Each structure stands twice: as structure tokens, then as C-alpha cells.
């Protein structure tokens, strides 16, 4: 199946540490619901979780990109998933980009365990989501 890829940036979901931008998430949900109304096929969109959009100062940019920071990233994406759980157009998520966003983890050999923890975080309440590796 061909998917439409929609980027979702951590700094838009959680612009300050442990503070989620509910207005952004409501806007994302409204956009996805509108697309459903306008004919988007069910399970046709994959969200592409990215680290930083490049806009403004992002609190996590100065942090070491380690497993602990990746857990915070995962929590933010899980929070976003809760806000859009009723959007039928969402098929799931691309797996995080370990070649550019999380290169330190990839070099440390932690990519596979981080991927598994990312998927496991979603399994309990979002088991219907697909997870697709980058090519």
C-alpha cells in the first residue's frame, strides 16, 4: 500500500520540557478529520516523527541524544497518538530516523532496542498502528 507521509516534529508537540502544545495537537487532529471528510482513505497516512523543525529554540537541542532523551521523544509521540486516536486516516508511524535525528544511538548500537521500545510504548493502546522502517 502507498502511504502519504506526514512529518510531526517533537518541538511542535512538546515545545517545552514536559509541556505539550495541546493547541497544535488539536489543530493536527482537526486537519486529519477534515482530510477524512474530504475523502482520505482509511489507514492511508503515516506520521513521520522528527526531532526538530528548525523553528525557534527547542529545549532538547542542547541535550545529549541518548536513550533517556529518546524515551522523552517516544513519550511525546505517544501523547500525540492519544490526541489523534480516532483519526481513521492514520495507519501508524514511520520509525524514528536514526541516520539523521538519532545518529549517536545508531553509532552506539542501540537502534534496534530503541525501535523495539518505541513500538512497545504504542502496543498497549495503539496496537492497530503499523510501524514502517525508512528505506
How would you label these PLM feature ranges?
Residues 67-135:
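Active-site region of glycoside hydrolase catalytic domains
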